[in-house]
Regions:
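Sequence termini and other peripheral, non-core segments
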Residues: 1-11, 23-30, 119, 139-151
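Membrane-interfacial, low-structure loops and terminal tails that flank and connect transmembrane helices
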Residues: 2-9, 73-88
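N-terminal membrane topogenic signal
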Residues: 7-19, 87-92
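A structural feature that tracks compact, well-ordered secondary-structure segments
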Residues: 32-64, 71, 106-143, 147
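Alpha-helical transmembrane segments
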Residues: 16-20, 52-56, 92-96, 128
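Phenylalanine-focused residue identity feature
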Residues: 11, 44-45, 66, 80, ...
Length: 151
């Protein structure tokens, strides 16, 4: 029993950032679904959904995916793979952001941009663009005194 509890705590402890981020995102979604988007608070909840979706994707995507040359991405493990698979792995973060970003764009195009959820999805498209831009820019550009630029 104690071993199971320790293992459970360990899992929660090891994934607490992604779990908490997902919980906060779920809270914003719940609050927005109950609010009037024409009010300040309703508009805030809608914007918070896009922001926290972006935060959650940064936490999870940079945990599991890679982007060769980007200071924002962790280094891929050194093991032998076929060159095509290695290229896919080395750029999996950009590929993931492009594919899911296109999904958000298609969803946004199918919605009324002025509707309650259309505004949120539009903000998510903007967030995805920012994340992809950050990943791509950090492959080339540097920022003085940034620990990521020292790599």
């Amino acid at each position: 029993m104690a071993e199971t509890r320790t293992r459970r705590r360990s899992f929660i402890r090891q994934h607490s950032l992604s779990i908490t981020s997902a919980a906060v995102l779920a809270l914003w979604i719940y609050l927005y679904s109950r609010s009037n988007p024409s009010t300040h608070i309703g508009s805030f909840f809608g914007n918070a959904i896009a922001d926290w979706t972006g935060l959650l994707v940064m936490v999870l995507a940079t945990k599991y995916l890679f982007e060769r040359g980007s200071a924002e991405s962790r280094r891929p493990p050194k093991n032998f793979m076929g060159s095509a698979l290695q290229r896919l792995r080395d750029h999996s973060l950009t590929i993931f952001l492009l594919v899911t970003g296109l999904g958000w764009v298609f969803l946004y195009a199918s919605l009324d941009s002025e509707s309650k959820w259309g505004q949120v999805v539009g903000n998510i498209v903007s967030e995805w663009t920012q994340i992809l831009g950050l990943v791509l820019m950090t492959k080339i550009l540097i920022e003085r005194h940034s620990k990521e630029s020292n790599r």
